[in-house]
Swiss-Prot record:
InterPro entries: CA_dom, CA_dom_sf, Carbonic_anhydrase_a-class. It comes from Vaccinia virus (strain Ankara). GO terms for cellular component: membrane; viral envelope; virion membrane. It comes from the Viruses. The chain crosses the membrane at residues 276-294. Coiled coil: none annotated. This is Cell surface-binding protein OPG105. GO terms for biological process: symbiont entry into host cell; virion attachment to host cell.
Length: 304
C-alpha cells in the first residue's frame, strides 16, 4: 500500500483508542531558538536543545525546527482538520531520532526517524504575548529566502496548549519528502488576528510575472485516508476535540442565521400561505430557545 500523505482530516469517531498512548514527556526548557527564516513559503525557526520522550516513543527525539502555516483569512489556515474543522493556522514542531541516527538528514530516510507535533492556532480577541515573540522577529525576514538571528528570549513551553491529549498517525512531512509520525494536539492556542495578519506581509519566492508576491497562504489541503491508515487517540481526546469554543461559536452563528431566514419566510408568507408562515415562526421559537440554552451553558463554562 502507498504511504499515507499528510495532512489529513481526522474523524474523531473513527479514531482508535490505544492504551499505549501515555502522556508525552516534553523537555523544551533547554531549547533555544537560533535563527528565524523566511523560506519563501513559510516561517521556520531553528532550535538548539530540547527533546520529547515518553508516551509511545521508543527513545528521545530531538527538536530541530518550528514551522508556521496560515491562510488568506482567519477562518482557515491549518494543514490538518478535526472533523472537517480548519483552524486559523498551525505550528509544526519537527523532531528527529538522535539516539538511532547520526543526523536529521539520515533520520528522515526512515519511518521512525521523524516526529512532528502539530499545534493549532485559533484567532481570538486577545493577543498571545508568547506568540508575539515570534511576530516581533518578522520584520527582519520580510524578504524571501532571508535568515536572521532570533534575538529574543523565547520559551517554547509557553506555546503548548492547555491540554496535551493527542491524535497520532503515520504520514509524511508536509512537502512529502520523508515519512513522519504525527502527534496532533486538538486543543488550540489563541492568538489575535493582528498577529496572524503580520505573516501575510512576508514576501514569497513566487515571481512568475516579475512582481513581488506575498505569502498570503501556505497551508495544504487534506489528503484522502488510505484504507490501511489508522488514527489513534489518547485520553479524553474526543470530548476535548469536539467542545472547543470556536466550534460552538460557529454553530451558534449558523443557528442564528437559520433563525433569521425562518423569520424572513414568516414575514413573506404571513399574508398568503399561512400554514407555511406558522411553520416558519414555530422554527423561529425553537431556534431561539436552543440559542438561549447554548449561550447560558457557554457562559457557565467560561466562568468555570
Amino acid at each position: 500500500m502507498p504511504q499515507q500523505l499528510s495532512p489529513i482530516n481526522i474523524e474523531t469517531k473513527k479514531a482508535i483508542s490505544n492504551a499505549r498512548l501515555k502522556p508525552l514527556d516534553i523537555h523544551y526548557n533547554e531549547s533555544k531558538p537560533t535563527t528565524i527564516q523566511n523560506t519563501g513559503k513559510l516561517v521556520r525557526i531553528n532550535f538548539k536543545g530540547g527533546y520529547i520522550s515518553g508516551g509511545f516513543l521508543p527513545n528521545e527525539y530531538v527538536l530541530s525546527s518550528l514551522r508556521i502555516y496560515w491562510g488568506k483569512e482567519d477562518d482557515y489556515g491549518s494543514n490538518h482538520l478535526i472533523d472537517v474543522y480548519k483552524y486559523s493556522g498551525e505550528i509544526n514542531l519537527v523532531h528527529w531520532n538522535k539516539k538511532k541516527y547520526s543526523s536529521y538528514e539520515e533520520a528522515k530516510k526512515h519511518d521512525d526517524g521523524l516526529i512532528i507535533i502539530s499545534i493549532f492556532l485559533q484567532v481570538s480577541d486577545h493577543k498571545n504575548v508568547y506568540f508575539q515573540k515570534i511576530v516581533n522577529q518578522l520584520d527582519s525576514i520580510r524578504s524571501t529566502n532571508t535568515s536572521a538571528p532570533f534575538d529574543s528570549v523565547f520559551y517554547l513551553d509557553n506555546l503548548l496548549p492547555s491540554k496535551l491529549d493527542y491524535f497520532t498517525y503515520l504520514g509524511t512531512t508536509i512537502n512529502h519528502s520523508a515519512d513522519a509520525v504525527w502527534i496532533i494536539f486538538p486543543t488550540p492556542i489563541n492568538i489575535h488576528s493582528d498577529q496572524l495578519s503580520k505573516f501575510r506581509t512576508l514576501l514569497s519566492s513566487s515571481n512568475h510575472d516579475g512582481k513581488p508576491h506575498y505569502i498570503t497562504e501556505n497551508y495544504r489541503n487534506p489528503y484522502k485516508l488510505n484504507d490501511d491508515t489508522q488514527v489513534y487517540y489518547s485520553g479524553e481526546i474526543i470530548r476535548a476535540a469536539t467542545t472547543s469554543p470556536a466550534r460552538e461559536n460557529y454553530f451558534m452563528r449558523w443557528l442564528s442565521d437559520l433563525r433569521e431566514t425562518c423569520f424572513s419566510y414568516y414575514q413573506k408568507y404571513i399574508e398568503g400561505n399561512k400554514t407555511f408562515a406558522i411553520i416558519a415562526i414555530v422554527f423561529v421559537f425553537i431556534l431561539t430557545a436552543i440559542l438561549f440554552f447554548m449561550s447560558q451553558r457557554y457562559s457557565r463554562e467560561k466562568q468555570n
